[in-house]
Amino acid sequence: NDYCKIKCSSGVHTVCQYGESTKPSKNCAGKVIKSVGPTEEEKKLIVEEHNRFRQKVAQGLETRGNPGPQPAASNMNNLVWNDEQAKIAQVWASQCQILVHDKCRNTEKYQVGQNIAYAGSSNHFPSVTKLIQLWENEVKDFNYNTGITNKNFGKVGHYTQMVWGNTKEVGCGSLKYVEKNMKIHYLICNYGPAGNYLGQPIYTKK
């Protein structure tokens, strides 16, 4: 697959720039890498947690918000795992550019959006479910009627991508590493088709 042919206005495709290898880059020096990529069990948990939360919101059961509750949705797809999106997410995660979005991650099939999470603990690696819940919790600042604006995007953008009604597939890359005695779990999820278009409703209200 020639990713150099996939064009984004924002820049060069991640796989074109860094190649197909998911081996941690020399940029990861100083981090003791314990594992690269989600396990099969974690992949299942990622999809399950996304769909559990998407269904909760779709059914109108999410009471948090500014104001809450969030309206029910009529177009909330169930997400499935996409290996290609996961591979591209992993190539980027393995560059160790922590909490930075890559410039181009599209596939031939989709424009692709991205969520990034990072958490650490002194005694265990935080679970993927914990990381995804960080995104979910942004709902507390979200007003459905205002939608996504330049002003609120930094506070709610992970939540809005997570429950973007039209998104169909998710694929994630991850690293677990030790740095300064902290056990850190770093997760990047890529979403196709992408969400978070300014001025569009995040899902259709029921």
Curated annotation (Swiss-Prot):
CDD domains: CAP_euk
A cellular component annotation (GO) from this entry: extracellular region
InterPro entries according to UniProt: Allrgn_V5/Tpx1_CS, CAP_dom, CAP_sf, CRISP-related, V5_allergen-like
Protein localization: Secreted
Main localization category: secreted
Expression sites (tissue/organ): Expressed by the venom gland.
Cystines in this chain: 4-16, 8-104, 28-96, 172-189
Cross-referenced SUPFAM superfamilies: PR-1-like (SSF55797)
Entries under SMART domains matching the protein: SCP
Domain SCP: residue ranges: 48-191
Keyword terms of this UniProt record: Allergen, Disulfide bond, Secreted
Family classification: Belongs to the CRISP family. Venom allergen 5-like subfamily.
PANTHER family: CYSTEINE-RICH SECRETORY PROTEIN-RELATED (PTHR10334)
Full protein name: Venom allergen 5
Organism: Polistes gallicus (Paper wasp)
